[in-house]
UniProtKB/Swiss-Prot annotation:
GO molecular function: ATP binding; ATP hydrolysis activity; RNA binding; RNA helicase activity
Catalytic activity: ATP + H2O = ADP + phosphate + H(+)
Compartments in which it is found: Nucleus, Nucleolus
Coiled coil residues, start to end: none
UniProt name for this protein: ATP-dependent RNA helicase DBP8
Domains as described in the record: The Q motif is unique to and characteristic of the DEAD box family of RNA helicases and controls ATP binding and hydrolysis.
Helicase C-terminal domain ranges (all copies): 247-387
Domain Helicase ATP-binding stretches: 32-208
GO cellular component, one term: small-subunit processome
Biological processes, Gene Ontology terms: endonucleolytic cleavage in 5'-ETS of tricistronic rRNA transcript (SSU-rRNA, 5.8S rRNA, LSU-rRNA); endonucleolytic cleavage in ITS1 to separate SSU-rRNA from 5.8S rRNA and LSU-rRNA from tricistronic rRNA transcript (SSU-rRNA, 5.8S rRNA, LSU-rRNA); endonucleolytic cleavage to generate mature 5'-end of SSU-rRNA from (SSU-rRNA, 5.8S rRNA, LSU-rRNA)
EC number(s) stated in the UniProt entry for this protein: 3.6.4.13
Disulfide bonds: none
Species annotation: Meyerozyma guilliermondii (strain ATCC 6260 / CBS 566 / DSM 6381 / JCM 1539 / NBRC 10279 / NRRL Y-324)
Keyword field contains ATP-binding: yes
Length: 433
């Protein structure tokens, strides 16, 4: 089957061919014709499945038949994923002079408002920043959203979690009713929130929702080419163990992502490893967007061998050739573990994952093993004597210096200031009402 067989526009066929995308993946072959037929869609979207084209191709095909106003809105949980999706839209639509606006945090709101006012064909946004514009930028700016034809929730399982609830509600209020638009959800796992949407009554005049390969929790699997292991350590020496793993003969040249749960931890580790002469970059929410983008570019290009990241890097991002994933902090949700380790062992390649487990993490590890139906192996490359001899003293000294530097610089103050500003804007908006 070809993209032509799926009903994609001729100009888009040429764009796909220019990008050397010639044959549709399973999710593309099944979803594209159904979306073109006017159906809402819930699609299973494993890493590397080609899900962006699965929704972008039919949206852009229908847009080219009636290119008027803001045609589609794509909501996604992270800034980096929004930028990546926008790049694909622009590449696909270059021959048609497509206009795409990226509306994410960390960028100038006034500049964004002016872009939205120009009615770009597609808006790619994070819910929080779009909600800010709806609340504060006025109907002249966001009024075009009332007439969109498509709404896409990418990484829908995460977007429909409690952390995005209030922002999504504000975004949905300005959009056309569900009966007057197509809604496309792409998700890696079926949460209760996604399942509830799947089972909702179909609005009058609409076709039944199309479902593609939804993976239930009891079918969760990790790649066969991925080795998963752990080390069990006291919490106060976790950084020393991390350093020893990264400089061990097995991993000293490996491209690695180290996942943590907090921005503060990410910054400490970045500074500590840099002092220990490891080429390192970081990615977390307290970094300015320009620095976040630069970190990703450096890691992709190999200028940084190690990326320290919170879960903003765990989903959807196209980062090829990651050989090792380290869980410096163990995630509370087993699905987050799956997304993290899914950054390696992609497309049949081999990859490794190491979880650094302390006494407080045991229940989380057991929950993960139960979820993936597989036991982790003990990592043999590190042992207590080796850590004490090679890493503990130098890592402790580097960490102490890093913490002192962060205190001098007032790390974390920007987040507090931004939080106060958001609270003030919300109060002002309520007063105006």
């Amino acid at each position: 089957m070809s993209f032509k067989d799926l009903g994609v526009s001729k100009w888009l066929l040429e764009a796909l061919a220019a990008m050397k995308i010639r044959s549709p993946t399973s999710i593309q072959a099944e979803c594209i014709p159904q979306i073109l037929a006017g159906r809402d869609c819930i699609g299973g979207a494993k890493t590397g499945s080609g899900k962006t084209i699965a929704f972008a191709a039919p949206m852009m095909t229908k847009w080219s038949e009636d290119p008027f106003g803001i045609y589609g809105l794509v909501l996604t949980p992270t800034r980096e994923l929004a930028l990546q999706i926008a790049e694909q839209f622009l590449a696909l639509g270059a021959s048609m002079n497509i206009k795409v606006a990226v509306v994410v945090g960390g960028e100038d709101m006034v500049k964004q408002a002016l872009e939205i006012q120009k009615s770009p064909h597609f808006i790619i946004a994070t819910p929080g920043r779009l909600a800010d514009h709806i609340l504060n930028s006025g109907d002249d700016t966001v009024g075009g959203l009332k007439r969109i034809k498509f709404l896409v929730l990418d990484e829908a399982d995460r977007l429909l979690s409690n952390s995005f609830g209030s922002d999504l509600e504000r975004c949905f209020k300005i959009l056309p009713d569900a009966s007057k638009r197509q809604t496309l959800l792409f998700t890696a796992t079926v949460t209760d929130a996604v399942r509830a949407l799947k089972d909702k009554p179909v609005p009058e005049g609409k076709k039944p929702v199309f479902i593609h390969e939804i993976v239930s929790k009891d079918q969760v699997a990790i790649p066969a080419t991925l080795t998963i292991s752990y080390v069990f350590v006291p919490s106060y020496v976790k950084e020393a163990y991390l350093h020893n793993i990264l400089v061990s003969p097995k991993y000293e040249k490996a491209s690695a992502i180290v996942f943590v749960n907090r921005t503060y931890t990410a910054e400490i580790l970045r500074r500590t490893l840099r002092k220990l002469d490891i080429r390192v970059a970081s990615l977390h929410s307290e970094m300015p967007q320009s620095e976040r983008t630069n970190s990703l570019h450096r890691f992709r290009a190999g200028a940084a061998r190690v990326l320290i990241a919170t879960d903003v890097a765990s989903r959807g991002l196209d980062i090829p050739n990651v050989e090792l994933v380290v869980n410096q902090d163990i995630p509370a949700d087993p699905d987050d573990y799956i997304h993290r380790v899914g950054r390696t062992a992609r497309a049949g390649k081999k990859g490794g994952s190491v979880s650094i487990v302390s006494e407080k993490d045991v229940e989380r590890i057991l929950a993960i093993e139960n979820h993936i139906n597989k036991k982790m192996d003990l990592l043999e490359e590190v042992n207590d004597d080796k850590i004490i001899k090679e890493s503990l003293s130098i890592v402790t000294a580097a960490k102490r210096e890093s913490v002192a530097d962060m205190e001098k610089e007032g790390f974390g103050e920007k987040r507090k200031i931004n939080k106060r500003k958001r609270e003030e804007r919300t109060r002002d908006s309520k007063k105006r009402k």
